[in-house]
Amino acid sequence: MEKSKTPRLLEKYRNEITPQLMETFKVKNRFAVPRLDKIVVNMGVGEALTDIKILDKAMEELGVITGQKPIIRRAKKAIANFKIRKGQPIACKVTLRRAMMYEFMDRLINVAMPRIRDFRGVPMDSFDQAGNYTLGLNEQIIFPEIEYDRITRAQGMDITFVIKYAKSKDQAKELLKLFGMPFKESKE
């Protein structure tokens, strides 16, 4: 039986990032260092209200991008202004953990982001109070797994990096920087 290969970013985290964060934040225990817990990729598909095939196509594309089958997200409550009824399918999402999470992050940072037109980095102000980082992408075309000829419409997505054990936004920001996340330079 063949032993599965450890993802490159996981090796980097264990061998380089953890010791560096321990030194930077004066942490004695390596288990108290900020760690990437999961990545949630969400595609909101408002047009699915009129045509369910659009949601099916979005689910197929999200599955190809992440390598995992997406789940359908339904409306929690009715919103009359948007013509949404409770329980209607309006989005699809994937939660990535362990090896698949690191593989996806590697492809996102090193393959997909450089393909974004006029890319100057991701904004630094998208951290919440818990240290989680949310990134919005306008198109799914930047991923090499998506065939340009087969897409019917450009579909955006939100990618949330859930970070455990970060005591502040700065610790979470430092972790993502060490992973290679291309943040915009702050104007001071």
Give the role of each language-model region:
Residues 1-188:
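Ribosome-associated RNA-binding proteins
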